[in-house]
A protein has these predicted regions:
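Active-site glycine-rich loop that binds ribose-phosphate moieties when present
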Residues: 1, 22-23, 27-42
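Internal, conserved structured core segments that host functional sites
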Residues: 1-19
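Mid-sequence acidic-hydrophobic segments that form the walls
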Residues: 7, 41, 45
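Short, surface-exposed recognition loops or helix-turn segments adjacent to catalytic cores
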Residues: 14-23, 48-54
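A short secondary-structure junction signal
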Residues: 16, 23-26, 30, 64-68
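C-terminal accessory domains and tails appended to enzymatic cores
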Residues: 45-48, 52-54, 58-144
Length: 144
């Protein structure tokens, strides 16, 4: 989705979240009508330039989904682990934080919504600039 936005194409990232980090085909099939209705609504929206929607579906049957929440981006926190592995070409690689993950974030975060049985919809922008700090940092710098 981020690549699409960089090319000027409105984009939606849709993920199956929560529970085991593997897709259950029966659950995905059950959620098709919910996803179709949600996408019908979301694709009708006019999104600002450089914006994408990050949608996370809870690992529940469609009948158990409690609704949709507009959310803020939470933060996934991985355990402090370093695993030495090999890639498919037999090159040595390191996987950082490959253990179990937890999350942190406010009550209005995407993780909280999904954990509580809601679909989370988080508007994201590609510009990660901390604008307030940028303005403050201009005071730090003087030309040599």
């Amino acid at each position: 989705a981020m690549e699409g936005v960089t090319l000027g194409v409105p984009a939606i990232a849709l993920s199956f979240a929560g529970g085991e980090l593997k897709a259950d085909p029966a659950l995905l099939t059950d959620q098709i009508p919910v996803v179709a209705k949600l996408l019908e609504h979301l694709t009708a929206l006019k999104m600002p330039r450089d914006t994408l929607l990050n949608v996370n579906m809870p690992a529940r049957k469609a009948s158990e989904i409690r609704g949709v929440r507009l959310t803020r981006l939470g933060r996934r926190v991985y355990s402090d682990s370093l695993m030495k592995m090999q890639d498919p070409r037999k090159r040595e690689i390191y996987w950082i934080g490959g253990g179990s993950a937890s999350w942190s974030g406010a009550a209005d975060s995407d993780f909280r919504a999904v954990e509580d049985g809601y679909i989370s919809v988080t508007p994201l922008t590609l510009d990660l600039t901390h604008l307030k700090m940028l303005d403050e940092a201009k005071l730090w710098w003087t030309e040599p």
